[in-house]
């Protein structure tokens, strides 16, 4: 509603032009789709998430994506999402239930603990606003940190975990990419055109 409100008040209409020349109507339907579903749909591979790693790599390469063999399974999939799927999401789309490995600070989804309570709002082929529920269970958070750290256990933020043990109420947050939104609304050709206070040279030229 906020983006629709801004569009109406700034432009006097509810539509903007996408990068491919098509029209995006913020007053229209905003799609909601799970990460696993959109990956399976756009790769035309319903069993993508059960494929062995080498098969994922082969399919990603066939899509024109360079893949480092050292990447984890979830990283390979996310490369496919970011480089071949996200750019095609022109109309407003909430992508939900991302893999838990992508955001270790997010709360696990109660209906699928392999995913997290998160959404990414994609418009015009870009992520405009990521949001998620904060993990406030210290035991679950420690497990995520340990999985992320692997053998580098010293990287775990124990002070943060101790703070969680003292108690944290339910919380969540969202960050809107204002610069990307301004580009979308104004048709700016470069992100530098949206910076309110760009760096400038001193008057003496130094």
Predicted stretch roles:
Residues 1-206:
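Class II aminoacyl-tRNA synthetase catalytic cores and aaRS-like
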């Amino acid at each position: 509603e906020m983006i629709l409100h801004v569009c109406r008040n700034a432009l006097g209409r509810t539509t903007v032009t996408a990068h491919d020349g098509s029209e995006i109507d913020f007053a229209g339907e905003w799609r909601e789709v799970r990460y696993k579903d959109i990956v399976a749909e756009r790769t035309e591979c319903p069993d993508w998430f059960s494929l062995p790693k080498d098969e994922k790599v082969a399919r990603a390469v066939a899509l024109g994506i360079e893949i480092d063999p050292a990447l984890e399974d979830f990283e390979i999939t996310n490369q496919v999402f970011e480089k071949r799927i996200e750019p095609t999401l022109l109309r407003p789309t909430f992508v939900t239930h991302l893999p838990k490995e992508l955001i270790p600070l997010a709360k696990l989804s109660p209906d699928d603990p392999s995913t997290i309570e998160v959404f990414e709002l994609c418009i015009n082929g870009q992520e405009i606003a990521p949001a998620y529920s904060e993990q406030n269970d210290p035991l679950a958070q420690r497990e995520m940190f340990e999985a992320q750290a692997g053998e580098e256990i010293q990287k775990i933020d124990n002070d943060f975990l101790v703070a969680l043990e003292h108690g944290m109420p339910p919380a969540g947050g969202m960050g809107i990419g204002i610069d990307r939104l301004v580009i979308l609304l104004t048709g700016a050709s470069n992100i530098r055109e949206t910076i309110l206070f760009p760096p400038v040279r001193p008057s003496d030229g130094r």
